[in-house]
Amino acid sequence: MSKFARRCAALMLAVVLLCMAVPAAFAAEGDALPAGATTMGGANTTLIPDEEENCLSWLFGSGDTITMPYLNVKGQGLRRNVTLDLEDCLVGITYTELGSIGSYVSDAAAQQAWKAQAVAIHSYLEYHKKYGSSANALVYTPVDQIPSSARSAIRRAVSEVKDEVLTCNGSVIDAVWSASAGYNTQTGVYGTCSGLDAWGTDVPYLQSVESPYEEQYHNLMRRVIGKDYRYIEYNDSKTGQPYESADTTHKDLGGFVQYNTFVSNGKSYRYIGQFVSSRYCFDFSADENGTPCMNYYGFGHGVGMSQCGMVGYAQEQGMGYRDILRHYYTCLLYTSPSPRDVEES
């Protein structure tokens, strides 16, 4: 079918769908709307029907751009309805996340790490667009603010994978990641945290997996992306009270305190995030003076892909980006063309 014929057909379908939608707009005020699915964060996913959305994108052409409901832009803060060139978008966010790692690992390893990060970013953005959630956890660095050597190297990686997303059972996944995973003192294994243990929601592709290069690469990644991986805390962040006692004995593969198992000063916490910021891997102990304290390791929620771990896999084992992604995002998972390419084919 010619491009002109395709667009004519799409236009006719769009008109039909619009005519069907008009009566619904004048429905009685008390009419119930469809509930829609929800994300892990509880966002309602009642959206334009996929057929209509795809039809309009096919008709008018999405090209190589991506539009996000919300996005943090470096130096500009949180912006709404941001439209960017897809490749520039992935280059800018990948740089924010991983920086110039090519200065610290081999070019081949850096390329695979950047590719893995870019595919995870693209999947995350598409997931949150699809389900009506804001993707404002990400920060886009405008490409003209990225040093030219880093920009060129990252663009070389991104250009080869910009049309790939991650799917599980046919749907794009919420490809979350964090700077590092943790260490389980009980098993002696470094690994990630499952979605169930971190947030109380069992997600098939967010399971605990081993991630052996955390300790080896955390100092490197701290220099690259400027995040602290170790610190000591003397007060409970939720109450501001000094620690007197705590129980952190129930841990998952990654050494993260499990869902609904932390007790501090006699109080049980249902969600770990209610009392610390974003660091969830810790042990209760005492400092050299005998003062009770929390020793934290890692940065981030520890769920999904570990940035320290994936850089380690690329450098130490020569692992390619697809194998890295399959390792961290379990389930029957594969990479595929983005919805944008399917519509344009």
Say what each PLM segment does.
Residues 334-345:
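Single conserved hydrophobic/aromatic residue that forms the stacking wall/gate
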